[in-house]
Amino acid sequence: MSDGNTAAAWVPTGSVTVRVPGKVNLYLAVGDRREDGYHELTTIFQAVSLLDEVTVRNADVLSLDIVGEGADKLPTDERNLAWQAAELMADHVGRAPDVSIMIDKSIPVAGGMAGGSADAAAVLVAMNSLWELNVPRRDLRMLAARLGSDVPFALHGGTALGTGRGEELATVLSRNTFHWVLAFADGELLTRKVFAELDRLRRAGDPPRLPGPGPVLAALAAGDADQLAPLLGNEMQAAAVSLNPGLRRTLRAGVQAGALAGIVSGSGPTCAFLCPSAAAAVDVGTEVSGVGVCRTVRVASGPVAGARVVPAPTEV
């Protein structure tokens, strides 16, 4: 007999699987460093079709396993944001975090696509469904923001304008599908080091600042890749290239292969290339792969939905 205090007394058995996308930054303007050490950001995120699958089951204790690309590089304990998400959600509802988490990774690790944040968002959604908590979306967003600046967008998906540290989101109208080639350079760029390098470059001579995001928003609303291409911009790009000069070769290779434009996404080391069509993206991806300027190349499209429960297969 249960004493009424165990998870088994109040949650159904079974498992829940959530798919969650990686992101690219189409536009990123960085304000000066604030007193709290953060920078004020204005960014436009787009969720793209590189998806992690996160499965959560009821268990006796909290555990985390990771398979897929780059799994061996990731911690499977409290250092992992997905583990922290499970503890936070359980604490929010006054329960023990007794779940097993399995992450099947397709979002490249240390690629600047917020894969760790995506997995954390997926855990929140999966536990909400598995435990039938009915935690409202606004509360999930609040929990997500406590975990990290990129976690709320992984919940949101689609295309969004982010402000503050990037966690304050407004939905952006984005017509049509945009086609991307994502090239992941060798080496890892730590976000804090890229910000520090940007601060140094600005003290030395102030690299150019982007105009406001209005024209980018208009191009997205029009669904016009040709209109969007010259407007892609990232004020962190100069710092990322300064720390990893090989990114310059990657950007050049993508444009020479036929991309409309290329940009370092976020703090890098991912380069995102906008292509005129799905077929063109495959061609650009093949050519960039052959040049040998990056470790991995992926073709993706966006926008796609944020973290969503995968419907269980129906029995016939």
Curated annotation (Swiss-Prot):
Species the sequence originates in: Mycolicibacterium paratuberculosis (strain ATCC BAA-968 / K-10)
Ligand binding (ATP): P108, V109, A110, G111, G112, M113, A114, G115, G116, S117, A118
Superkingdom assignment: Bacteria
EC assignment: 2.7.1.148
Family: Belongs to the GHMP kinase family. IspE subfamily.
Biological process according to GO: isopentenyl diphosphate biosynthetic process, methylerythritol 4-phosphate pathway; terpenoid biosynthetic process
Coiled-coil portions: none
Catalyzed reactions: 4-CDP-2-C-methyl-D-erythritol + ATP = 4-CDP-2-C-methyl-D-erythritol 2-phosphate + ADP + H(+)
Keywords: ATP-binding, Isoprene biosynthesis, Kinase, Nucleotide-binding, Transferase
Tagged with keyword Phosphoprotein: no
InterPro entries: GHMP_kinase_C_dom, GHMP_kinase_C_sf, GHMP_kinase_N_dom, IspE, Ribosomal_Su5_D2-typ_SF, Ribsml_uS5_D2-typ_fold_subgr
UniProt GO molecular function: 4-(cytidine 5'-diphospho)-2-C-methyl-D-erythritol kinase activity; ATP binding
Designated name of the protein: 4-diphosphocytidyl-2-C-methyl-D-erythritol kinase
PANTHER family linked: 4-DIPHOSPHOCYTIDYL-2-C-METHYL-D-ERYTHRITOL KINASE, CHLOROPLASTIC (PTHR43527:SF2)
Active-site residues per Swiss-Prot or TrEMBL entry: K23, D150
Pathway entry: Isoprenoid biosynthesis; isopentenyl diphosphate biosynthesis via DXP pathway; isopentenyl diphosphate from 1-deoxy-D-xylulose 5-phosphate: step 3/6
Pfam families: GHMP_kinases_C, GHMP_kinases_N
Enzyme class: transferase
Function: Catalyzes the phosphorylation of the position 2 hydroxy group of 4-diphosphocytidyl-2C-methyl-D-erythritol.
